[in-house]
């Protein structure tokens, strides 16, 4: 399985870091601190819970890249999405 959490964990990249993944996959990841949330940011690691949270992930990533969440919130509001 090439799920991001499993790959990152197997390579020691989740050690002491917060993350989220889909389903119960977190039970198979030894390193890291699982957080039950749609999107989790831990410094330069941004993880998403799954396809159902694609908007949350995309908006979070956009805000990070822009360095400002105000324009991202404006766009979310424009499509009637609460973020």
Regions found by a protein language model. Name each.
Residues 3-83:
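Active-site-adjacent pocket-lining segments in enzyme domains
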């Amino acid at each position: 399985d090439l799920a991001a959490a499993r790959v990152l964990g197997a390579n020691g990249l989740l050690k002491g870091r917060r993350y989220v993944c889909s389903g119960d996959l977190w039970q198979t990841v030894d390193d890291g601190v699982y957080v039950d949330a749609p999107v989790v940011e831990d410094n330069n690691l941004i993880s998403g819970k799954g396809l159902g949270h694609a908007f949350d992930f995309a908006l979070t990533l956009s805000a990070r890249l822009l360095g400002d969440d105000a324009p991202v919130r404006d766009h979310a509001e424009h499509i009637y999405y609460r973020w």
